[in-house]
């Protein structure tokens, strides 16, 4: 089983599936924004950035998964992005489930001055929605609740694949 897990991270197909799943989520977010007319809030924008981190990890892993340093860089980016995405989605769910004048998100994105993504790519990163508003549901779960499940799944798969790569084996030097 460990050998199988090590082999997964050493193949482009697995990294491609990771990138494709994140690309699907990004395209879905743009569909919700531009076709259905839902306005992204600050937390939505940050969650998009976390998904872009997972997408970037998948693309980095596809470059040369047999090279340990690229594989581990992709794994670390994947793990960090999934973890931060889960934190953000949980906080976003808290804003929605416990609305209060004292529990609100900022109306402005707080990107570093050296990377003002909301100014560089406003069509993707400009927030103009309300974090506590539930404007869409599927199977009675809001979008941030679905993102909790998605980021938790990304994190779980990351942990399993990473454990497989930490254990010494005969594969994938």
Curated annotation (Swiss-Prot):
Gene Ontology MF annotations: electron transfer activity; protein-disulfide reductase activity
Membrane-spanning residues: 15-31, 50-65, 73-90, 146-164
Keywords: Cell inner membrane, Cell membrane, Chaperone, Disulfide bond, Electron transport, Membrane, Oxidoreductase, Redox-active center, Transmembrane, Transmembrane helix, Transport
Cytoplasmic side: 1-14, 66-72, 165-173
Organism: Aeromonas salmonicida (strain A449)
UniProt protein name: Disulfide bond formation protein B
Family affiliation: Belongs to the DsbB family.
InterPro entries: DiS_bond_form_DsbB/BdbC, Disulphide_bond_form_DsbB, DsbB, DsbB-like_sf
NCBIfam families associated with the record: PRK01749.1
Pfam families: DsbB
GO cellular component assignments: plasma membrane
Cystine pairs: 41-44, 105-131
Chief site of localization: membrane
Residues in the Periplasmic compartment per record: 32-49, 91-145
Gene Ontology annotations of biological process type: protein folding
């Amino acid at each position: 089983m460990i050998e199988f897990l090590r082999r997964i991270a050493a193949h482009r197909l697995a990294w491609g599936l990771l990138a494709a799943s994140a690309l699907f989520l990004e395209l879905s977010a743009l569909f919700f924004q531009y076709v259905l007319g839902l306005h992204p809030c600050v937390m939505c924008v940050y969650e998009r950035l976390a998904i872009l981190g997972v997408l970037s990890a998948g693309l980095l892993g596809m470059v040369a998964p047999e090279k340990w340093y690229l594989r581990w860089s992709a794994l670390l980016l994947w793990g960090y992005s999934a973890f931060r995405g889960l934190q953000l989605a949980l906080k976003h769910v808290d804003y929605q489930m416990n609305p209060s004048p004292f529990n609100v998100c900022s109306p402005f994105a707080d990107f570093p001055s050296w990377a003002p993504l909301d100014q560089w790519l406003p069509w993707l990163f400009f927030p103009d929605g309300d974090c506590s508003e539930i404007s869409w549901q599927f199977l009675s779960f809001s979008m941030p609740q679905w993102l909790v499940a998605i980021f938790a799944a990304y994190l779980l798969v990351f942990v399993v694949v990473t454990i497989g790569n930490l254990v010494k084996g005969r594969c994938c030097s």
